Amino acid sequence: MADVSANRDPQIKAGEIQSYLVEDSVHIYRGVGVCVNTDGYATPMGDDSGSVFVGVALEGVDNTLTGHAQGGKRVRVQMPGNAVFTKDTAAQTDLGLPVYAGYDGTVVVAGSSSHKVFVGTIIEIV
């Protein structure tokens, strides 16, 4: 295969918006990571067994109020693209490392994650 020798238009697809049913008795805050649990319901991002990261909440949804039920509310989520998360002790040498769901809206590296809920790759330290 020949080396690239000219500019080309990138084939990039921006993250899309998806709506998910919310798990019972959870409050998802706008701007935090969202996972889907093993029952298929949205929860705040966390290092939970069987969870899958699906994106960032575009709105807050409180499914703890009177009359709450599993799937009783929906949350709109911006699907994977680029997002800013907090990582303790981030360093320039972390660029390119995979990160996994921590708790309280944070991400961690592999050694600090029990269930390896993959969130993405570090592309910038801010």
Language-model-derived ranges and their functions:
Residues 1-126:
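Surface-exposed, low-hydrophobicity beta-strand/loop segments enriched in small/polar/acidic residues
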